[in-house]
């Protein structure tokens, strides 16, 4: 299934950054963190609440959606590679 939509406020990059504590523990992660949050925002904007608004787009799949949200909750370590993938996908028209 599709993960719960964080809501219009929840997908905001600034809210995401605050939640993740971007750059608090390690300043080097701030850029990566910001990029991730922006990618996550674009992902949700593109795919909508349940992925239906992104029909025909390969990025709008439940696997990626869950990965984005797990990373966003800090359950998995956000690696530069994962972030790069999310940001790259999210940037695709």
Swiss-Prot record:
Key words of the record: Cytolysis, Disulfide bond, Hemolysis, Secreted, Toxin
Disulfide pairings: 16-37, 22-33, 47-60
Keyword Secreted attached: yes
GO BP terms, alphabetized: killing of cells of another organism
Record GO cellular component, one term: extracellular region
GO molecular function terms attached to this record: toxin activity
Tissue expression summary: Localized within the skin and proboscis and are most readily isolated from body mucus secretions.
UniProt function note: Cytolysin that shows hemolytic activity (on bovine erythrocytes, HC(50)=5.75 mg/ml). This hemolytic activity is completely inhibited by small unilamelar vesicles composed of PC/PG, PC/PI and PC/PS in 1:1 molar ratios (with at least 100 mg/ml concentration).
Name of the protein in question: Parbolysin P4
Organism annotation: Parborlasia corrugatus (Antarctic nemertean worm)
């Amino acid at each position: 299934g599709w993960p719960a939509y964080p809501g219009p406020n929840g997908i905001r990059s600034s809210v995401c950054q605050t939640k993740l504590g971007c750059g608090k523990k390690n300043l080097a992660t701030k850029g990566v963190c910001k990029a991730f949050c922006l990618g996550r925002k674009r992902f949700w904007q593109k795919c909508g609440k349940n992925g239906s608004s992104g029909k025909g787009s390969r990025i709008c799949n439940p696997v990626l959606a869950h990965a984005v949200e797990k990373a966003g909750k800090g359950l998995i370590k956000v690696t530069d590679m994962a972030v790069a993938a999310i940001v790259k996908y999210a940037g695709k028209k």
